[in-house]
């Protein structure tokens, strides 16, 4: 190793990492090689694992890097402030609606409608409504007197617990809201939102988000994103669409739904329902157009899957498995696999056609390129060899078999060997051969190399 400058801070860090993980001897040799006696005494605040996972990487960067990092942090904070302002403006104090505007907005109360869109809406508890139009949207609304609407956009809005609203747009945000009647939401952003206590909702769309909501009457939803959402305690719902998401909801009256996503959702305890569509997911729940494994435990739980390869296992009494196509319950405990198979076969045909076309194009390109290559006259030692793209096997037999006693020029090797070898090659059996080649003829008119 030689001399390591102690300014780097990494040296003691490695030393302590080795000692903590039981590599005491290595730590001692490390100390000898670095020649620093204070290594063993000094304590290091940073953990090597944290350093490697880039959590605590800043202290070891150069001043320039730190400057860059500060700039990015400032821009992050600015965007955070903007999003908070927007959310404050969008939420009036009395009976708030959460809607995504600047694209034509529609809001409805006490009903759920969706028009000309890929949408999945799940509404639970009385007097709740969710509507979405002309968009890929998923909206889940729970508890009385709440409404959420999104139009002409990829949006997801969830409103839960009466008199709560959430809206925000185009920001990278981290929002945490605690205590009742609070809301945190972010769209088109990377966000981490955690909401705790009753009547809180957190939603994020088109983002990488981690949202965890705890306490009763809470919902966390994320759309078009990589998200992890976990909601615990009763009356909670977590939904994610167009995303890779993990959502786990525990305790009674909870629902988790995810669409167009890779999601893992697990709901435990009684009165829980969960939906997921167009996704690869491991869900406690239901999945449509996806490969999924779903397990729902405890009584009064439902899991439904449509148009998918899915395996669902429901444990404990009072559980149903439904298959739904476009949100409607078609039959109990049945899976529609035919439609998905048909669609895949159609896709295969299309792809094969495209492949053939591309092959034809490549072939044409080769022909045009070979003519130009062969027409070139360059003074390289291999000018006689010709164009490599024209090289082929000497005979069709060689194409199938790697070696069938035929040499590069199509002659049978075992016959020709006897002729081409010189005198010195064949001698009495017990005498040592003097060399592999002694005389004989060499074919000087070789026009191509074959491999």
UniProtKB/Swiss-Prot annotation:
- What are the GO cellular component annotations? nucleolus; nucleoplasm
Q: In what residue span(s) does the LisH domain sit? A: 6-38
Q: Name the residue ranges with Polar residues bias.
A: 320-332
The record's subcellular locations are:
Nucleus, Nucleolus
Which portions of the sequence form the region Disordered?
59-394
In what ranges is there compositional bias, type Low complexity? 99-120, 146-174, 200-228, 301-319, 333-343, 369-380
- Check the record and name the SMART domains matching this protein: LisH
Biological process (GO), any one: nucleocytoplasmic transport
Give coiled-coil spans as residue ranges: none
- Which UniProt keyword terms apply here? Nucleus
Q: Which Pfam families match?
A: LisH, SRP40_C
- Transmembrane annotation, as ranges: none
Q: Which residue intervals are annotated with compositional bias (Basic and acidic residues) in the record?
A: 73-98, 344-365
Q: What is its main location?
A: nucleus
Composition bias, Acidic residues: 135-145, 189-199, 243-253, 278-300
Name by which UniProt lists this protein: LisH domain-containing protein C1711.05
Give the organism, scientific name: Schizosaccharomyces pombe (strain 972 / ATCC 24843)
């Amino acid at each position: 190793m030689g001399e390591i400058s102690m300014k780097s801070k990494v040296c003691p860090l490695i030393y302590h990492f080795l000692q903590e993980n039981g590599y005491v001897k290595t730590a001692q040799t490390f100390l000898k090689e670095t020649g620093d006696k204070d290594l063993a005494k000094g304590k290091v605040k940073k953990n090597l694992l944290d350093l490697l996972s880039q959590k605590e990487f800043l202290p070891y960067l150069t001043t320039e890097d730190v400057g860059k990092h500060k700039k990015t942090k400032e821009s992050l904070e600015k965007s955070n402030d903007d999003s908070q302002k927007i959310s404050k403006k969008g939420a009036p104090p009395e009976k708030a609606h959460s809607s995504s505007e600047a694209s034509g907005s529609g809001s409805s109360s006490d009903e759920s409608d969706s028009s000309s869109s890929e949408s999945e809406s799940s509404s639970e508890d009385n007097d709740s409504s969710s509507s979405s139009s002309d968009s890929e949207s998923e909206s889940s609304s729970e508890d009385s007197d709440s409404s959420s609407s999104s139009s002409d956009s990829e949006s997801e809005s969830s409103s839960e617990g009466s008199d709560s609203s959430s809206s925000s747009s185009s920001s990278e945000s981290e929002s945490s809201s605690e205590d009742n009647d609070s809301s945190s939401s972010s769209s088109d952003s990377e966000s981490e939102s955690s909401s705790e206590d009753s009547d809180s909702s957190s939603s994020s769309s088109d983002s990488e988000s981690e949202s965890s909501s705890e306490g009763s009457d809470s919902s966390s939803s994320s759309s078009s994103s990589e998200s992890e959402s976990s909601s615990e305690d009763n009356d909670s719902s977590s939904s994610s669409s167009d995303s890779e998401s993990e959502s786990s909801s525990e305790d009674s009256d909870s629902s988790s739904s995810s669409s167009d996503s890779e999601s893992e959702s697990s709901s435990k305890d009684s009165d829980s329902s969960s939906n997921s569509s167009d996704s690869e997911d491991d869900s406690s729940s239901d999945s449509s157009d996806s490969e999924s494994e779903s397990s729902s435990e405890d009584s009064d739980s439902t899991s439904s899957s449509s148009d998918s390869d899915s395996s669902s296992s429901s444990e404990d009494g009072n559980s149903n498995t439904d298959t739904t196509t476009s949100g409607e319950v078609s039959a109990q405990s049945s899976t529609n696999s035919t439609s998905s198979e048909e669609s895949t076969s159609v896709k295969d045909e299309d792809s094969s056609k495209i492949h053939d076309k591309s092959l034809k194009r490549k072939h044409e390109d080769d022909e045009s390129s070979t003519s130009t290559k062969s027409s070139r006259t360059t003074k390289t030692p291999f000018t006689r060899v010709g164009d490599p793209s024209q090289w082929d096997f000497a005979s069709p037999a060689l194409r199938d078999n790697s070696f069938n006693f035929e040499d590069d020029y199509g002659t049978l090797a075992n016959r020709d060997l006897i002729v081409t070898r010189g005198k010195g090659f064949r001698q009495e059996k017990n005498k040592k051969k003097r060399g592999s080649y002694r005389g004989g003829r060499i074919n000087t008119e070789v026009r191509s190399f074959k491999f």
